[in-house]
Structure formats: C-alpha cells, structure tokens
Amino acid sequence: MFASRFDPSQLTAPAASAPEGIVGTTPPAIVPLKRQATESDNEEYGSHQDSDESSNSSSEEDEDRMQVDYGASEEDSSEVEEEESKPSTHSTVLSRFKQTVSLQERLGASDIAESKEDESIEDEAASTHQLKQIPQPEFVKNPMNLNTNSLQFKSTGWLNTEKIYYDNSLIKPFSDYANELEAKLLQNICKNFSTNTFPIQSIILDSILPVLNFTLNVSKRNFTRRIGDILVNAATGSGKTLAYSIPIVQTLFKRQINRLRCIIIVPTKLLINQVYTTLTKLTQGTSLIVSIAKLENSLKDEHKKLSNLEPDILITTPGRLVDHLNMKSINLKNLKFLIIDEADRLLNQSFQGWCPKLMSHLKTDKLDTLPGNVIKMIFSATLTTNTEKLNGLNLYKPKLFLKQTDKLYQLPNKLNEFNINIPTAKSIYKPLILLYSICQFMAHSPIAAKILIFVKSNESSIRLSKLLQLICESRSQSSVLKNLQNLAVSINSVNSNNSKAENKKIVANFSHPSESAGITILITTDIMSRGIDINDITQVINYDPPMSSQQYVHRVGRTARANELGSAYNLLVGRGERTFFDDLNKDLDRDGKSVQPLELDFTLLESDSELYTSSLESLKNYHNNTAQA
C-alpha cells in the first residue's frame, strides 16, 4: 500500500557522474504517495511492532487521525507535484521519504488486515445477482384463442377487430326469434330450410337483429353505423348463406320503393344460382326484387333490364359488376348492404380491379360519404388474414365472428377423415387402388354412394375418368373389384374440354342421380371446391393432395354439410406426401377428432395386372384417335 523506503545514497553516484554545467537534465521518477510494503521493508517494519500493538487498543481514534493525516499528506503531495516541474533537489525527496515513514509508524498490521476485511465485505456487498422480473399486472386475454402458432403470426389482419366467439352448442329453434323477425319471413325459413339454427346463424342473429330492429325504428338513416362491418370465418356447409340473407330480408321487408340496397358478390356462376335460390325462398310472399348478373347473359340485355327495373338485391360476380358500373347500369346511391361471399378467393384475384373500383363508386355515388355508410359482410371458410387486402375494403368498426378454437380453420363437425397410405413401389397402380378403395366403402355402405374425387389439373381429370371407365367395363375380370360387379357405376368428369352446357348437365345428373344409380362418381378440380352446395355427397376423395390447408378445407367441405355425416379419404403416396399432409393439419380444427389411417389389404393378382395394363393401352389408343380426329 505504501512506497518502499528511499535511500539517498543511491542518487549521489548518478549526480556525481553528470557532466559539469548540466543540472537535473533527467527528471526523477514520481514515487506514489502510497505503495504496498515490499519484502525489503520487513526488517524495519518489525521494529515498530510494539507501537503497533499499543495502537490496536485505540484503532478507532487512530483511524480518525489517519484520515486527517492522509488528507494533509494529499495536500502536501499536490505541492510536491507542482515543485517537480522545477529542477529536483535532495530536500524534496527526503521530505517525501519522511512523510512515508511517519505514516507507516502510525498504521499497524491490524489496521491493514481490517482494511482488507472491509474491502472484502464491500466486494461481497457489491456482488452481482440474477435479475428478477418486476411483478406485472395479469394480462386479460382469451386463452382459448391466443395460440402463438396461429393467431399471433397468421391473423395479424384481425388484431384490431372486436372478436365474437361461438361454438357448436349454439343451436336454437328459429321460433326463439319470433319477436325479432317478420312473421312471413319466419314462416319461409321454417318451411323452406330448417326449424333450428346453425351455430353461426345463432351468433350473427343474436348480435345483429336486436340492434338492427331498434335502430330502424329510431332512424333509418344511421342504422348502418350502429351495426358496423362483419367478418365471418366459418366452416363450409355451416349455413353462411342463410346467416347473411336473413338480416337483409328483415331490413328490406317493409321498403316502399324498390332501390338497389344490397349487392352480393360471389366468385362463380354456380354460386350465383345457389344464393339466388336461397333468397327467392326467403322472399316468397313479399314485393322484394332479386336479380342476377352473370356472363352467360347478354350484357346489353342486362343493362336494359337493370335500367328499367331497379332490383332490391343484386347477385353478381366481380367482373360483371365492374361492367355494369362502367355502363352506369346501376347506381350505389341507396346501397345499404355489401356482401362478399368466399372473400379469400375474391380478394386474392383482381377481377378487373373490382375492389378499388367499387370503393371509388361508393364515395362518388352516395350522398353520405362518411365511414360506415354501408354494412359490409365478409364471409369465408378460410377468411384471409392479409392486412393489406382487408384494408382495401375500408372496414368500419369490424366485428369478427369465429369459432372458439386455437386453430385457423374449422372442419365440419360430423366429418370423418381417413388416410390411405400407398407405398411408392405401388404408386403406378394408384387408379386401381382408388377403385379398390371404393369397393371397400361399398362393402360397408348399403345405400347408394355419391363420390366426389379431386385431382390436381384439368388433364388429370380427363385421363383418370376415362381410365376408370375402361377398367370398370372389364371389372368382371378383376379379383379386387368384385364388390363392383353387381353395381351400376357412373363416372364423369367436369373439365374445360366440355362445353358449359355439358358441364352443367353433368353436375345436375350428379346432384340428382336416378333411383337405380348405384355409384355416382364425379372427377373434378378445385373449381368445384368452393361454394357448391350439392346435397348428400357421401365421400370426398383427394386423389391428388391439396396444395394448402385452405384447399383442403374447401374440398372436404363438400361433404358433411348441414350437420349431416360425411367422409373424406386422402390417397398419400410415399413418405413425402404423408409429411406434407401432417403440415397441413397444424392449421385445422377437428373438434377433438383425428385423421384415422385406413389399412387396405391390396393384393394384386396377375389378372388384375393384365386388366390394368390393357386398360392403359386402350386409354393410349383413345387419346391417339381423339388427337387425329
């Protein structure tokens, strides 16, 4: 802690050897005021041991004096440092030496030990420890619907909406709404549809009807702002069409003059017909006018019809809507409802820039240009979560209706799913395995089957349908197809090679087969996976796996509709397709169910192999003849 003692004799030799005339050319080294005692001081330090022992009895007083002396020594040292800038002298060095000696005499060994103990105590007191989180108030949230794998990362477009949850227990009779619905409307619902609601219908009617009826009685002008916009994410076949149709008809039921007050936008012509049928049944016995606009009709004739007789409700596709807006066939001045069905598909495709065009006309045509002047209802089984696309709709106080689950998409409650794993070595016989699987279905199903098969492309649909027809024509020669030998099998394909009339006829025959039909099979692409309401589809088969969980939801949603039983079968070839399907399952809610593996005892005999080979050869000849023709 203190400097070693200084010997003046050591400086005489260098000073004597210095040349004459030069004084203090080399500045002396600055010796610190306090240094730790070196081993050379041990002998002299021992001579003062007696005085140190006496100082131990009054250590506190010595410490006070030491602090005073230490302060004085610091002042002296500052003076010494100022003098060191001048030529050094022996007297300066000796005075510093004496100061050091006097301090060492006053400071005993026990004081040094105590100072070290104090330093160690201070070190212990200043030791670091693990950081602890400051207590925070509990965050109020819904644990059933805040899963980090789904909503936090995939549903950013819904973060600013009011969420309203429902579950499968929300089923009630429509008669409970007798005080909220017009008597004629309630009669049409119970007569043409059902006496009980579906869960999504219950939650929407409970949330909208009381506010809607109260606001209409007070002020019809501002009722749209009291309701706000609505986003609905519900499984296919859950009754979404009826859910948005009932509030519309209830609002327009007592209108005096027909004006365009509702536009319903759907992606396909087939869905136009389906929605039109629903609204026609709901509006029976009323003066409401429901019209459609689609590509099959002449644009000129539609323009003339809409100009002469303005409808209350218009059902159309986005492209045809843009055509009529450009031709000024319709005016949005009195529009109160805008319904977008299958919204994820419509918002993912431009369709002549229909969304910006429509929003622009809403601003220019309507006298009331403030937000919330139109109630927008957005429906889909796989509602988009893209913030940019939802922002283009200019939503006003949106409410999100979704099922109480931690998954992104919901499957029908009464859907049963099965996986048929096909080894890679047997993938060449996949069409034959498909027919064999259908044989197994029929062995446990005494009723007629209506089977919808999805493939990846239009060409696959054409080839597979023809190949299955050729195999079934000679199925009596096969051992694996023995269950099909006594049944009538009808196989058709919906594809772009057919005319619109042919495809329409094929779909109609599939929807309403004859009483003698045993198995009716329709092979199609994803064009029929959305919005097509065909009753009594018993099985859906994914011959080619879907590309996303959205496609899977829409495909299997063609069965198990309206709370009826249905089955879905997935043909998976090799480990790669099985792994891909497992990834799709992460976004799907099955209400506690799981996909069951279906083991098939597929033993291929020589006769089956010969039948399959001959069918492939016949298919090749058929395509060659078709190409030449």
Swiss-Prot record:
PROSITE patterns the record matches: DEAD_ATP_HELICASE, HELICASE_ATP_BIND_1, HELICASE_CTER
Keywords: ATP-binding, Helicase, Hydrolase, Nucleotide-binding, Nucleus, Phosphoprotein, Ribosome biogenesis, RNA-binding, rRNA processing
Residue positions where Phosphoserine is found in the record: 73, 77-78
Taxonomic lineage: Eukaryota, Fungi, Dikarya, Ascomycota, Saccharomycotina
Family: Belongs to the DEAD box helicase family. DDX51/DBP6 subfamily.
Enzyme class, broadest EC rank: hydrolase
Residues in Helicase ATP-binding domain copies: 221-401
Example of a GO biological process term: rRNA processing
Name of protein: ATP-dependent RNA helicase DBP6
Record-linked SUPFAM superfamilies: P-loop containing nucleoside triphosphate hydrolases (SSF52540)
Motif residue range(s): Q motif: 197-205
Organism: Saccharomyces cerevisiae (strain YJM789)
Subcellular location(s) per record: Nucleus, Nucleolus
One function term, GO molecular function aspect: ATP hydrolysis activity
Note on domains (UniProt): The Q motif is unique to and characteristic of the DEAD box family of RNA helicases and controls ATP binding and hydrolysis.
Listed Polar residues bias regions: 88-103
Residues binding ATP, per UniProt: 234-241
Subunit description: Associated with pre-ribosomal particles. Interacts with DBP9 and RSA3. Together with NOP8, URB1, URB2 and RSA3, forms an RNA-independent complex, which is required during early maturation of nascent 60S ribosomal subunits.
Chief location of this protein within or outside the cell: nucleus
Catalytic activity: ATP + H2O = ADP + phosphate + H(+)
